[in-house]
């Protein structure tokens, strides 16, 4: 569903139609299993500010909210015109549960995001300019009250007066599938790191398909290859845990 103009009255009325189906007392939004082990609480904590970064910032953000839409919840995307809907669907996002809101402009960004935090379970956006401490406090108070999550997609996290609760970053990304100048890209292998506050002060890392050849996020196979691709993986086998699951590394 698209909202062409960021009219606050229209957003408020829309919010009455798409209020979260889950109770705010359920303090976590479910995330894909391949990412759950990286997060300090195993999911996205309602009322929190999460940022995704690196070359796969959009993929990470979409993957994080995919299970929410699959469970019947709503997600809003504010001012991110290059966010790929085809990629979103491949990552498990139910597009019928996504509100696309045109860029409201810097002057109305905070008010638009606040209206949507009152209506949906997750808002994906990127602040167009530094966010004042008072504005951030109001947005997060709204998120806590309504049980929603605010997700920054790409861009510098320094735009916030207070650092995000979680920062999920994909680095050393390598696309696989092309060979000798021909073939098709089948998936992207990346190291995903999670840092932040409130239980995430010690960084955790894992190598994952982002996305996998079949879409979604998948761990590295137990034999040192990547699930779905027969070619040797560029991942150090020591990063692979039992039963094909990524071995989560804590730094520091």
Locations of regions flagged by a protein language model:
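Detector for small/aliphatic-rich hydrophobic stretches
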Residues: 1-77, 222-252
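Hydrophobic/aromatic beta-strand patches that form the interior of the parallel beta-sheet core
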Residues: 50, 76, 99-101, 151, ...
